[in-house]
Amino acid sequence: MHSSFIEQSSKTVEVFSTSVSSIEQAEFLLDKLQEEFPCYEINFDLEDCDNILRVASVGSNVDAEMVILIMEKHGTEIQIL
């Protein structure tokens, strides 16, 4: 009898409110964040009243401080929720 072991990696997610208001601005910032964090899953929800940014990482913690620094460097207000 063959048994298999499935390793499950934990995923960490950080959620931020932002001042991003346009798709163009979101796409620009996504490019900048993906350059710095190619392994993160990153997306915006601009339909939410807080213009949510979600950042997920599998197997390691999200570097929230660096995400905030990159966003602020590009003139975006951001706050971790």
Across the structure, where does each feature detected by a protein language model lie?
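Short amphipathic beta-strand starts and helix->beta connectors
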Residues: M1-S3, E35-E41
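Short glycine-/aliphatic-rich beta-strand segments at the starts of folded cytosolic domains
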Residues: S4-S22
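Short amphipathic alpha-helix segments
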Residues: V20-F37
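Short amphipathic alpha-helices in soluble, non-transmembrane regions
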Residues: L29-L33, E65-K73
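Conserved short beta-strand edge segments in small beta-sheet-based binding/regulatory domains
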Residues: N43, H74-L81
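RNA-recognition motif
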Residues: N43-C49
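Surface-exposed aromatic
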Residues: C49-V55
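Helix N-cap motif at beta-to-alpha junctions
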Residues: S57-V62
